[in-house]
Amino acid sequence: MAILNSTEIFFTEFEPKVQNRFIMSISGIPAYIIKGISGLGFDQGEIILNHINVYRKIKGKLRWNDVSLTLFDPITPSGAQAVMEWVRLHHESVTGRDGYSDFYKKDITLDVVGPVGDIVSEWVIKGAFIKTVDFGEYNWDNDTAAQNIALTLGMDYCVLNF
């Protein structure tokens, strides 16, 4: 017969991390225009080893998911201009020149902040680059929404420091 431990059955107080307490640092993009990020995670896949009429599975290569980033687009400093400056490191539309990955890949820091402003968790996104950008919609009928920019970022990998 199992004996229950009191720490397992009684509520233990804790302070949860909340979604709206974060600060992101991306070189060239002001932190205060970063509205949100989603999609941090990975997929390890699987490798199936067949043998006669049975099989065994082992993990495959770890592949980090793309992340979605949403920015506000203020008039000044222009969020669209900040994004396009990063895009121009990937590809210059006027000349057709592509950039080296050393120039356009960036390390991004996502600091999760506690209730008193202390950093309680830190993710570092290594080798981030822009895959897609959506500069939003302009519509005469909508007078209640701020303009947003949606980005999809590819990356090499992430590190959870603490």
PLM feature spans:
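Glycine-rich, low-complexity intrinsically disordered segments
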Residues: 1-162
